[in-house]
Each structure stands twice: as structure tokens, then as C-alpha cells.
Amino acid sequence: MTARNKRVRCKICGILELEHALAVSDAGGDAIGFVFYPPSPRYIDPAAASRIIAKLPPFITTVGLFVNHSAEQVREILNVVPLDVLQFHGNEDNDFCRSFSRPFYKAIGVGDETDVVAEAAKYPDAAALLFDTHDPQLRGGTGRVFDWSRIRHELGKPVILAGGLNPTNVAEAIRTVRPYAVDVSGGVEASKGVKSIELIQEFIGEVYREYEV
């Protein structure tokens, strides 16, 4: 299998409803994300996330998104929600991220001044690095694309591409970056925080179409 047709994995983040989680699974998605950051319009109560996970089919990875939570807060959520992976979007360091006995992804906001290599080097234990558009006011879910040419594959970690992706641009993003996975939230929403089953299906369909080329 060539690099051209290795299947890119797909994560849909900001899930609030069971029907949308099942739509991800039915369409062939690989992972769903739950946002535990209260200021986000996609915030979900941990008990609600746990109820959704209990009804998921096998082989769907569940990811929890955290932003500068304390270790106690993270553990309280983990006591309620059976997450597979933790995803950190704040100023957490490597030691903090790895302290919960679960794989973790570290989000890196990419702006004009971001030294991508230096930022990546701070997280040697990350299972993957997630690159998103830098915005000092937002932690993910910016809805804006950054310069994909900034991503460097010599980072030595799987690359998850996020930031402004949607069904119309994800194919180009995959061809340009060749990431391990793509991550979308706002790009598959009918309105802020409200997922669209049709857009979820279109987005995942575009990801698979690139694999089939």
C-alpha cells in the first residue's frame, strides 16, 4: 500500500447527542470527541458522555478534550467517563499529560510565529500531535484554516490535522498534509454546537474517497 492510499483516520469532536455519535460509527468514522471545557458551546456533562459511550458499538475510540483542568478535575471525569484517549488543548506539560495512565494527544495551535518543531518536542510521550489554528481566545473549534505547509512530518509523531475542516476542503487537506487523521467539529454542524448527520456523512465520505483514489 502506498502513502497515497493509506486510509486517513477520522475523528468527529464535540458530540452531544447519541444519534450523532451513532452517525459517526455508521458512516465509518474512527473516533468521537467529548468536550469537557465548560466555556465551549460543545461542552457535555460527564454523565451524559458516559451514557453515550455505553451505547456505542465496538472499535470506536472515545476521546476527552480538556483545557487547563487540574489533575483532580481530570480524574473526577475519568471516574465517570470511560475514555480511551485524553486530548489536551491548554498549557499542560508532558508530565501532566502522561500522568493519567492513558494515551494522550496534545493540541498545538499553529500561528505565524509558531515554531512547530520546538512545540512538538515538548511532548515526547504524546500518542499523536493535533495541529489546529492558533487563537488566544479559543481552544479548538476556531472554524479557521491555518497554513498547512507549516506541518512537518519529521516530528516523529502521528499528525492529526484540525482547524476549519469541512466536507468541501478535507480532501485537499489530506492531499496536502498526508496526516494520520483529521479532526472536525464546527465543519459538520448545522449551527453552533449542533451536529448535522448529513454533514457528518459527507465529511467521512470525502475522507474515504481520498483513500479510494
Swiss-Prot record:
GO molecular function: phosphoribosylanthranilate isomerase activity
Family: Belongs to the TrpF family.
Pathway: Amino-acid biosynthesis; L-tryptophan biosynthesis; L-tryptophan from chorismate: step 3/5
EC numbers, comma separated: 5.3.1.24
SUPFAM superfamilies: Ribulose-phoshate binding barrel
Catalytic activity of the protein: N-(5-phospho-beta-D-ribosyl)anthranilate = 1-(2-carboxyphenylamino)-1-deoxy-D-ribulose 5-phosphate
InterPro entries reported in the protein's UniProt record: Aldolase_TIM, PRAI_dom, RibuloseP-bd_barrel, TrpF_fam
Organism: Hahella chejuensis (strain KCTC 2396)
GO biological process: L-tryptophan biosynthetic process
Protein name: N-(5'-phosphoribosyl)anthranilate isomerase
Keywords: Amino-acid biosynthesis, Aromatic amino acid biosynthesis, Isomerase, Tryptophan biosynthesis
Pfam family, any one: PRAI
Signal sequence segment: none
Catalytic EC class: isomerase
Lineage, top ranks: Bacteria, Pseudomonadati, Pseudomonadota, Gammaproteobacteria, Oceanospirillales
